[in-house]
Amino acid sequence: MAKNRFNQHWLHDHINDPYVKMAQREGYRARAAYKLKEIDEQDKLIRPGQVIVDLGATPGSWSQYARNKLAQGKKRDAEREGGIDGTIVALDILPMEPIADVHFLQGDFREDDVLHQLEEVLEGRAVDLVISDMAPNLSGVASADAARIEHLCDLALEFAQNHLKPDGALLVKCFHGSGYSQIVEKFKQQFKVVAPRKPKASRDKSSETFILGRQLKHPR
C-alpha cells in the first residue's frame, strides 16, 4: 500500500510539474532539457561552431536543447528545417530515437569500437563541451550509491581529459552525499575553474546537483 501511495503521489507531481508541461509543449523528450537550458543561460556554454559530446544521452533532451541552440535561425521548429552551426555527438548504451543533425553512437564510450566511431565523426577535432546527465540506478544504500555516482563522474572526467580542448568545459550530474566532496576535489585537480550548479528545474526534494569544470589544467 505504501508503495502504491508513493507511486500515486509521484505521478500526481509529475503530471502537474510545470517543466513536464513545458517539455510536452515545446517538444522536448524530458524535463531535463530545462536544467541544461538554465545552466547554459547562466554560463554561456553552448556557442555556434562548437563540437559537443553528450554522454548518457538517452532519451535525448540535452541533445535536443544543444541542437536547437546551434540550429540555423532562431525558430523553435528549426529541427524540421535542418542544419546546425556545429557538431553534436550523443552516446549511450541504450537506444535513442533519432534527432535531426545529431550523431548518435550506441555503445559504451570506453570501448575501442565506439571510440573509433567517435573519432570518425570528429575528424580529428577536439571537443569544446562535454555534457553528462548520466545517473546510476540508485539502490538506497548510501555507500553503494555514492560509489556508483562517483564512478560515472570519473568516467566523464576521463573522457573529458582525453577529448576536450584546453579551454573546453565539462558539465556532469551528481548528487549531494558522502562522495560529493571527493568528486568536487577531482574536478579541481583537472580544471582551473570549478562551480556547482543547482538549476530550478531540479526537483526540490532531489539531492541532484551539477558540477561545471572549465579550462583543463593538464590538456593532452
UniProtKB/Swiss-Prot annotation:
GO terms for cellular component: cytoplasm. Its main location: cytoplasm. S-adenosyl-L-methionine binds at residues 60, 62, 92, 108, 133. Pfam families: FtsJ (PF01728). GO terms for molecular function: rRNA (uridine-2'-O-)-methyltransferase activity. Residues 198-220 are annotated as: Disordered. It catalyses: uridine(2552) in 23S rRNA + S-adenosyl-L-methionine = 2'-O-methyluridine(2552) in 23S rRNA + S-adenosyl-L-homocysteine + H(+). InterPro entries: RNA_methyltr_RlmE, RNA_MeTrfase_FtsJ_dom, rRNA-MeTfrase_E, SAM-dependent_MTases_sf. It is an enzyme of class 2 (transferase). The active site is at residue 173. It is found in: Cytoplasm. Signal peptide: none annotated. The keyword Zinc does not apply. The keyword DNA-binding does not apply. Specifically methylates the uridine in position 2552 of 23S rRNA at the 2'-O position of the ribose in the fully assembled 50S ribosomal subunit. PANTHER family: RIBOSOMAL RNA METHYLTRANSFERASE, RRNA METHYLTRANSFERASE 2, MITOCHONDRIAL. This is Ribosomal RNA large subunit methyltransferase E. It comes from Burkholderia cenocepacia (strain HI2424). The gene is rlmE.
